[in-house]
Amino acid sequence: MLFTIEQLELIKKLQHTGMSSDQLLKAFGELEVPEQLQNNNTIAAALYSPLLVQHLTTPKSETPVKLTVQTVPTPVKSEPQSSNCSSPFEHPICSNAPRPIRSQRTPMKEITTLDDPNELEEFMKQGEEACILDMKTFITQYSLRQTTVAMMTGVSQPYISKLLNGNHRELSLRCRKNIYCWYLNCRRHPNKLAAFLADPTTRLETNGDGELIPQRRERYVFRPILIRMLESFFTQTPFPDLPRRVEIANACNHVLKMDKKGVGLMPKEVVSPQVVSNWFANKRKELRRRSAEASAASTSSASSSASSTANHDSVSVSSMSPRDEETSSRNTTPETAISPSPAVSTFEVSRPSAIISATSSTTSPISIPATIIPSVSPSALELFAMAQQLGVQLPVPFPTLPTHFFPFQMAPFYGNPASILKSE
């Protein structure tokens, strides 16, 4: 038969008082007598506020000492019982009252026993994955610890963790049903959970209707000296294991005691390994966020500079006129490809003999404005255009034709040269 550490300590204390095994059996029998009484208030008080044997602290003697057990009822504020709840454990118990001596591996029958056994079957019909999800939401909403659930259900904490993580196949069906019954009972009767809660840091409360009030976990406030210490530890080991976290927590508590000049630390000031783990996780998350922001900023700056350069080039190209483009293309052409004729401001044009009057035997020079004269060698079409502006007809020979003249009449051409050239 296996015993817990607490049970072994109690057995040793009882042995030190000089009690025999028969006296122990008789004492346990006397403790079971109040459970058979009909007075519910007396039963609840006897279970919740038992007095230890008065000879536990007396020195060991050779003669057997008579065992006396005395139970004193604790003042309890009674509430009217509901129609569907007749258990004496329905009454809320004062938080400062002594709690019963109970093995941590023994399930609480009053919490794991349902009023209606069919309720468990109806609950499990939706599938165990959905059952675990509902129970996990309930535990997270009310900030319950896995150790508290393990103590109430009689299942060890690692198996509670496996169940909540979805590895329910590693637990026996009996253990799973026991946990499900605990969840259904606490969900239906929140005052049971508030009364039997053994973890003082959770501090569950109920409202006027007997429903649980969700509690927010208290945030740990780090002092500057702790932040400096944790920063130094983070540079050494960003991912500390459990022994390392325990070492860091002990070092932080030691520094806090020195900072308070030997004054004891309050419960909310004590640094636990879980607090260290949370701080390291938040620190790693902050570093990842900063790195992501820096990379995003560098990428956006590079893209903006590239887009501004492209816009500048497009503006420079679009600002050039067709004449500028032609001039720039001509300027980029080698000099050997173009043989411009020297610029002249005046030249003589001879009129045809048929058009010139008989009295005038010579032609007079004509002055052409400088704006009409192109800067490069003009083409034949440009020459005809200038001649039209000046009112002069030019019988220019066309070397590719046999007659060496243009194949159309000159008079219509000077009137509308575009239509003539288009028709031809």
UniProtKB/Swiss-Prot annotation:
Keywords noted in UniProt: DNA-binding, Homeobox, Nucleus, Repressor, Transcription, Transcription regulation
PROSITE patterns linked: HNF_P1 (PS51937), HOMEOBOX_2 (PS50071), POU_4 (PS51936)
Stretches assigned to the HNF-p1 domain: 1-30
Chain intervals with Low complexity compositional bias: 293-310
CDD domains xrefs: homeodomain
Functional description taken from the UniProt entry: Transcriptional repressor which maintains cell fate asymmetry of AWC neurons in adults by repressing the expression of multiple AWC (OFF) genes, including srsx-3 in the AWC (ON) neuron.
Family: Belongs to the HMBOX1 homeobox family.
Name of this protein: Homeobox-containing protein 1
Gene name in the database record: hmbx-1
